[in-house]
């Protein structure tokens, strides 16, 4: 059992953290260096690129910081919940959603599930419910980043850092880490948004974004990008940032969110290499569920867009790009949530069939 619980610890966290810190430092240092070069055109492009990389690094590092703090606060309870409350498919899905919402990583949930299967604590059919529910848990991140509270980001970082550094109580330190991580998420989004604002008048980029209205292109681009960064939440966050600048339509944002769901399967597949057969089967279930879900919904993107537009908050006093930028981020987050909940409800009745298919 101890070997399974050790799976909770994030893999390769040190290299990833070092990469994020390097990207942040590069983004900070780029401005003065390029300003001294005297090449205005080149300076603008490189400055924009470094701000994007630096903002993305802050966003990812903030997610990591918040997730680590959440796991420190509720980690042991999450492991107990995951091991015990999966007696049927519906409880499994609810448990997977709750655990993933807390730890902010469907990949970590999948790794834990693999460990429980290998130890005989969970059947393959039970694990499928948890894997399906994990997708619902990841929608929490999109809902959080859709809030426009970037002006409070630096205050959140400062307060969180103070709690983390000066408090004597471990719980206060952990809550401070959560607050600082959340502030870094919003500050990273603000940096990325500022970096992309000049692109509003750059026609080739606008034409490229218009091509994302083709759902197949949007899904492919997001799947590849998510596979590279190994974080669907990062992809969704960037999509919401682009939407906040009015670069993409709601339908394009939905297609990109679909692609992120497929791309996140890469992490589980890589983690299953060289592992027991049960690990490979769980990873295959993850891929099948996400791909089948996108296949069901790809022809319904327009209807999904109409539905979330109907119940999402809007700003009728605005028009044109300004209204698109104001309305679309929350609509994309809501579409992402509706898609994952509905897909889980559609397939939750077929966990036995999924299990037999991968065990065949």
What is the role of each PLM region?
Residues 21-29, 51-65, 96-100, 157-166, ...:
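Hydrophobic core segments of alpha-helical transmembrane domains in multi-pass membrane transport
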Residues 42, 46, 50-51, 55, ...:
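Alpha-helical transmembrane segments of multi-pass inner-membrane proteins
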Residues 64-72, 113-118, 159-173, 268-274:
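C-terminal ends of transmembrane helices
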Residues 100-103, 109-137, 143-152, 160-164, ...:
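Membrane-interfacial helix-loop connectors
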